[in-house]
Amino acid sequence: MIDPRLPLTDIHRHLDGNIRAQTILDLGQQFNLNLPANELDTLRPHVQITKTEPDLVSFLQKLDWGVAVLGSLDACRRVAYENVEDAAHAGLHYAELRFSPFYMAMKHQLPITGVVEAVIDGIASGCRDFNIDIRLIGILSRTFGEQACLQELDSLLAHREGITALDLAGDELGFPGSLFRRHFNRARDAGLRITVHAGEAAGPESIWQAIRELGAERIGHGVKAVEDRKLMDYLAEHKIGIESCLTSNIQTSTVVSLATHPLATFLRHGIVASINTDDPAVQGIEIANEYLVAAPAAGLTPHEIRQAQANGLEMAFISEQEKQALRDKVFPIS
């Protein structure tokens, strides 16, 4: 269950993986695009997971229709704003939304820096309207190669004040972290916090690489860490958090069942691991499902679920003062 005395967070939530089906339909019609269906009910199977996908890359293809309709910077601004609205309606007090500006710009050749500006603007408007604390994580989409990632990094750093952290996502097997060392050196020099998708499609060596070569402070998914006892020891000792996404890991065939998911093992090993969604609109789930359905099915006790909820705030890329302010806001002590 969700503890109402603790801030509810989602620190692994893709903005460009959370574009509403209705918005895809609206924007598709606005820009005269040939969508796979012209009614909401018939469009959903094309933009939402309806069965377990065979691998991560197949899962990621479900995201493509969402960004295919981003025909203008105003469209990017709209989906950013709606992401904040969705987070607030899900009951979140704090979220870190991550996005790939290159991926969002690609289909309609939008200016990448313009996409970053539009997303920052949409998030700021949403935070004002819905009274929620949202931070942005810029993604380098490794699937598109080193040069595209340099363009993304340049655009993100041009708006450093609106970006909290940098992530590496996409085809983990085809584009290992070692290709992006110089990108992350620049990001760290600019003061960005670092999280990296690792140990989702590739093995523990990908997580070691993210830590040693890219400077990862947190690991996205990190499922394969369970295969390396020394790695789990290291994660626990150095408080390198794991952003767990339970339902997502089933849908991508990263784990075969919730019962075999390693989140409970991580928590019992002393690793700071949290519960998150990943791509809510594509997955057809929200954060409540992960706490009320997925976490118990993954073998977490009520105490462990509460610990994972507390870990979400502990892992957040904000100051200790900001964390305490959130605690006081949610459960004021008179």
Swiss-Prot record:
Gene3D superfamilies: Metal-dependent hydrolases
GO molecular function term, any single one: adenosine deaminase activity
Domain of life: Bacteria
Biological process terms in GO annotation: adenosine catabolic process; hypoxanthine salvage; inosine biosynthetic process; nucleotide metabolic process; purine ribonucleoside monophosphate biosynthetic process
Cofactor requirements of the protein: Zn(2+)
Disulphide linkage map: none
Its EC number(s): 3.5.4.4
Cellular component annotations (GO), alphabetically ordered: cytosol
Main enzyme class: hydrolase
Pfam families referenced in this protein's UniProt entry, alphabetically: A_deaminase (PF00962)
Cofactor binding notes: Binds 1 zinc ion per subunit.
InterPro entries per the UniProt record, alphabetical: A/AMP_deam_AS (IPR006650), A_deaminase (IPR028893), A_deaminase_dom (IPR001365), Ado/ade_deaminase (IPR006330), Metal_Hydrolase (IPR032466)
Extent of the signal sequence: none
Amino-acid positions noted as binding substrate in the UniProt annotation, renumbered to this chain: 14, 16, 170, 279
Active site: 200 (proton donor)
General function of this protein: Catalyzes the hydrolytic deamination of adenosine and 2-deoxyadenosine.
Protein name in UniProt: Adenosine deaminase
Organism: Yersinia pseudotuberculosis serotype IB (strain PB1/+)
Taxonomic lineage from the root: Bacteria, Pseudomonadati, Pseudomonadota, Gammaproteobacteria, Enterobacterales
